[in-house]
Amino acid sequence: MLQAKLSSRLPLNALLRIHHGAYAPCVHSLSNRFFNTEGGRTRGGLHSDCSVLRRVIYSQSAFRPSLCKTQHYGTRSFSLSSAAVVNSAPAPVRPYLRLMRLDKPIGTWLLYLPCTWSIALASDPGCLPHLGLLSLFGTGALLMRGAGCTINDMWDKDFDKKVVRTAARPIASGEISRMQALVFLGGQLSLALGILLCLNYYSIALGAASLSLVFTYPLMKRITYWPQFVLGLTFNWGALLGWAAVKGSCDWSVCLPLYFSGVMWTLIYDTIYAHQDKEDDVKVGVKSTALRFQEQTKPWLSGFAVAMMSGLVAAGVNAEQTLPYYAVLCTVGIHLTHQIYTLEISRPEDCWKKFVSNRNLGLLLFLGIVAGNLWKERRDTLLQNEEMFR
């Protein structure tokens, strides 16, 4: 009887989604629909039928992981995670959001953080970083990371089909054609250009110069075992651009060491990332530092970490940074040491965990730069007071 009622009042695809556990909100909406559309029945009878329905649905073990917890008065909890935002978007839009990796924001963070370091270093002593510039660069990082992923997937369509982790990407799976991706790429680059035009002329020219790296990086994995180095040159361009946006030009004594540190950082985290796919990369002919270093990965990463820390010290000295900055650098060094020492390159899940932990490292360094910059005002005040009493 219950089955007949359901089948007569619900679309077939909705019932199939319930059976396979792919449509979490159906528990709430299905019972409400059943309750509200059943005419001429007593409230108690409806309640008992709905209870049976819930017991049937909840008994499906495959469905349990997808359930949304409900609170009193019918209010459901919801998630604001990037993956949840993508999954809740209209179906025609979802492939494009996945193409720009909106469901995996770690890449946007890793592109954005060097920009924040540079903006914070360029701020006046005792001042917080310019919030407007941080917002502009954050939006630009989101768009350019999406554009980079679109270019990468257009180049790598045939490779992605052969790798388990990437076979479901929108272009490789056929959800989006290359022409559709090209149009979408044009839209992203147009919006990013609008962001760039908000900056000064020096920054506009500097930003435009990075486009060659954006387009050529995806090709590097075909011709060299060092594509991560080219990615580092691309991803850390914001270390130059951020300073220029604040000051109107680059102070190379600060910007170059900072940029160098960012490149070393990218070599660390993207080599770790590449170890997830090394077996598939060998099969399809893709090159990476993970394949170049193999069992010598940890010594190489240790060398990159030392180089990164040296560059950060040089940038701090040339930018006249203060005690809080160097205290945080010690913490950054500890983070890198732990990350490399505990890395298990044969376990993809550990590689992913170490890779995403670099967002926290980058945020920590940003906070250290901000704290060091605020401390400059205190230091300058103390120096002025000493001169007054001499």
Map each language-model feature to its residues.
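Multi-pass membrane catalytic core of lipid/isoprenoid biosynthesis enzymes
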Residues: 136-139, 157-207, 283-325
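N-terminal chloroplast transit peptides
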Residues: 1-68
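Cytosolic, membrane-interface loops and tails of multi-pass inner-membrane proteins
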Residues: 78-96, 149-176, 270-294, 342-350
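Extended hydrophobic alpha-helices typical of membrane-associated regions
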Residues: 88-94, 314-390
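Membrane-embedded alpha-helical segments that form the functional core of polytopic membrane enzymes
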Residues: 115-116, 120-155, 165, 186-197, ...
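Core segments of transmembrane alpha-helices
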Residues: 108-115, 184-191, 231-240, 298-313, ...
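Hydrophobic alpha-helical transmembrane segments
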Residues: 97, 108-109, 131-139, 182-186, ...
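Intramembrane alpha-helical segments
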Residues: 97-98, 147, 166-257, 337-344
